[in-house]
Amino acid sequence: MAAAAADKSTKERLLSTLDDLEVLSRELIEMLALSRSQKLPPPGEDTLILELLIQRDKEFQELMQTALEQGRVHQEMQSLEKEVEKRDSDIQQLQKQLKEAEHILATAVYQAKEKLKSIDKARKGSISSKEIIKYAHRISASNAVCAPLNWVPGDPRRPYPTDLEMRSGMLGNMSNMSTNGVNGHLPGDALAAGRLPDVLTPQYPWQSTDVSMGILPPHHGNDFGLEPPGHNKENEDDVEAMSTDSSSSSSDSD
């Protein structure tokens, strides 16, 4: 009997005790009703019913205390469940942040490895600055940085004046202009014909004819002259320096 009662829940035990109390109370009320109608019940029956009623009431009070205790435990369990849910949410948030940090760290590690590979590759194929400077000098000695407008790739001519072209050009002949003209003036017949003197005539195709046309105005007289520079010695030195640089570049390229 005790084992069967232990298997029942507190709610079932409370309901069973309430049913017993209800039955005993009804019997006790019926006995009181019979005593008023002068129909006495068997002797000792009322005492037995009262004892059972008191016993069931005691059991009911004990069950009520158990139920209250279980209610407090249930409330604690609910509060603990809420706390667990909160902690679980915090753990999930931390897990998400850890996943993001892991992704960032993995990306950083991958980029660092790639940089290390690039550094190792650069170290294996490194070139000293001296070699780069020598190569730049070799390029500058064999190639020009600019060319006349009529020069195209594949042209056998060099895109810059050589030593011979510098000496036979306008700058090289400026020192001889005073000897070819009268008192430093250009020859009158050349000016009258609307052309430059032979000393100023372009000797090579890369020399633009627009330069010569820009020097002579459309209307000129026989007395128009181009005054030579005041210091022929300085001009000769400049031409000599330019010729020396050009010849050195030509020799390097050859």
From Swiss-Prot:
One of its GO terms (cellular component) is core mediator complex. Residues 215-254 are annotated as: Disordered. One of its GO terms (biological process) is regulation of transcription by RNA polymerase II. GO terms for molecular function: transcription coregulator activity. InterPro entries: Mediator_Med4. Transmembrane segments: none annotated. Residues 72-114 form a coiled coil. Keywords: Activator, Coiled coil, Nucleus, Transcription, Transcription regulation. The keyword Transcription applies. It is found in: Nucleus. Pfam families: Med4 (PF10018). Residues 243-254 have a biased composition (Low complexity). Component of the Mediator complex. Belongs to the Mediator complex subunit 4 family. Component of the Mediator complex, a coactivator involved in the regulated transcription of nearly all RNA polymerase II-dependent genes. Mediator functions as a bridge to convey information from gene-specific regulatory proteins to the basal RNA polymerase II transcription machinery. Mediator is recruited to promoters by direct interactions with regulatory proteins and serves as a scaffold for the assembly of a functional preinitiation complex with RNA polymerase II and the general transcription factors. This is Mediator of RNA polymerase II transcription subunit 4. It comes from Danio rerio. The lineage of its organism: Eukaryota, Metazoa, Chordata, Craniata, Vertebrata. The gene is med4.
